[in-house]
């Protein structure tokens, strides 16, 4: 889902209206953060192509956007389900110990006893703390993303060590 130079930030959904607007499913928080990026990379027919954002607005739970050279619903329909990415360099620098969710997805999760629990499939925002959705062949685990639970994250080794009982 990600490459070294691009970060997936959303997906084009379906046409909206008669003038080429498109509904967007945002993977950012808040969802309208996508609108801060004037040029998007769209994965259309398995190739990345730049498209300029002409306008956008919040239409919860979606965004609706107008992209350059997409002026009618028939053209917009061809972009349904295309992924939206931005260049990784367009993301702000993070403080030590902070991570973008996209960088955690796919990492192996191991507890402090060395037992492999699975890989990070996604994250959930709950209000009190974020939660790692960790999947293995046997099951799915919901592990709180807290300073107590998360012992270490090593992006180079692609591993997260957690204080978590293998039976939970």
Curated annotation (Swiss-Prot):
Residues 95-168 form the PRC barrel domain. Keywords: Chaperone, Cytoplasm, Ribosome biogenesis, rRNA processing. SUPFAM superfamilies: PRC-barrel domain (SSF50346), Translation proteins (SSF50447). GO terms for cellular component: cytoplasm; ribosome. InterPro entries: PRC_barrel-like_sf, PRC_RimM, RimM, RimM_N, RimM_N_sf, Transl_B-barrel_sf. It comes from the Bacteria. Pfam families: PRC_RimM, RimM. It is found in: Cytoplasm. GO terms for biological process: ribosomal small subunit biogenesis; rRNA processing. One of its GO terms (molecular function) is ribosome binding. Belongs to the RimM family. PANTHER family: RIBOSOME MATURATION FACTOR RIMM. The PRC barrel domain binds ribosomal protein uS19. An accessory protein needed during the final step in the assembly of 30S ribosomal subunit, possibly for assembly of the head region. Essential for efficient processing of 16S rRNA. May be needed both before and after RbfA during the maturation of 16S rRNA. It has affinity for free ribosomal 30S subunits but not for 70S ribosomes. Binds ribosomal protein uS19. NCBIfam families: 16S_RimM. HAMAP family: Ribosome_mat_RimM (MF_00014). This is Ribosome maturation factor RimM.
């Amino acid at each position: 889902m990600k490459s070294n130079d691009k970060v997936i930030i959303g997906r084009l959904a379906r046409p909206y209206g008669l003038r080429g607007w498109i509904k967007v499913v945002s993977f950012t928080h808040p969802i309208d953060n996508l609108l801060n990026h004037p040029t998007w990379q769209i994965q259309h027919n398995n190739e990345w192509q730049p498209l300029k954002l002409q306008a956008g607005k919040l239409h919860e739970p979606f965004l609706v956007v107008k992209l350059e050279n997409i002026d009618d619903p028939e053209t917009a329909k061809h972009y349904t389900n295309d992924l939206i990415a931005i260049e990784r360099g367009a993301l702000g620098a993070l403080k030590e110990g902070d991570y973008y969710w996209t960088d955690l997805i796919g990492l192996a999760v191991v507890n402090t006893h060395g037992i492999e629990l699975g890989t990070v499939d996604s994250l959930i925002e709950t209000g009190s703390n974020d939660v790692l959705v960790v999947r293995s062949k046997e099951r799915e685990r919901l592990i709180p993303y807290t300073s107590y639970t998360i012992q270490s994250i090593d992006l180079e080794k692609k591993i997260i060590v957690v204080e978590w009982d293998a039976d939970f």
